């Protein structure tokens, strides 16, 4: 299984010739949906979902997401499946389990649904939340930036989930100086936990089990 990081919050996972894309938002300029078999979308914010790109994608593309996103994709009948906390399903040869219900607290007047996804019991992508799935997580895609996130919360999340490896996501708001800070934070915590925590550059891949 190969994981490739793209702009901001988007990743692409490939296995046995099948392609699964997570959160291809408007910050994602790379053509990540080309050749994709399925898409997982954690929530409705534009940096995680680009409705126009989904509508222009292959009609065979399968989309799994929360009710909030599905409501914006009603003109794609049959392509969109609503997922809720506790659901389990298979798509494009990947086994997926759903965890969580809500976006981390951001604006008090705008609650937003958010679903995290565990893929093949290997990769956990929480979206814009610090959801603890309560299961072993070999690879965590950890949010490292955003108006709803503090450094202390990120570190505590890494220590609670305690993954064997973690890669930065939700880092598209940083300039080069900010990304350097992310690298330092992850390196420091990696040494503390004796684990592999780091940031992948846009287009960089990692081979997983």
Where would I find each of the regions flagged by the language model?
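Active-site metal-binding motif and surrounding structural segment of the metallo-beta-lactamase
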Residues: 26-69, 138-141, 162
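A short helix->loop->beta-strand "cap" motif at the edges of active sites that frequently abuts
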Residues: 18, 58-62, 78, 161-165, ...
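Core dinuclear metal-dependent hydrolase active-site scaffold
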Residues: 1-34, 82-136, 147-153, 201-209
């Amino acid at each position: 299984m190969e994981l490739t990081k793209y702009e901001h919050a988007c990743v692409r996972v490939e296995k046995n010739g099948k392609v699964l894309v997570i959160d291809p938002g408007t910050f994602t300029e790379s053509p990540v949906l080309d050749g994709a078999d399925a898409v997982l979308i954690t929530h409705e914010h534009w940096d995680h979902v680009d409705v126009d790109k989904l509508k222009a994608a292959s009609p065979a593309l399968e989309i799994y997401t929360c009710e909030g996103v599905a409501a914006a994709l009603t003109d794609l009948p049959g392509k969109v499946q609503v997922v809720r906390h506790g659901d389990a399903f298979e798509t494009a040869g990947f086994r997926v389990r759903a965890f969580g219900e809500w976006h981390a607290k951001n604006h008090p007047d705008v609650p937003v649904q958010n679903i995290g996804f565990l893929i093949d019991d290997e990769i956990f992508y929480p979206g814009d939340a610090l959801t603890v799935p309560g299961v072993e997580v070999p690879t965590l895609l950890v949010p490292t930036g955003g108006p709803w996130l503090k450094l202390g919360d990120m570190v505590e999340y890494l220590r609670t989930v305690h993954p064997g490896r973690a890669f930065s996501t939700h880092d598209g708001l940083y300039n080069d100086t900010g990304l350097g800070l992310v690298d330092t934070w992850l390196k420091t915590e990696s040494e503390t936990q004796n684990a592999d925590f780091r940031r992948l550059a846009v287009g960089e891949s990692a081979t997983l089990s």
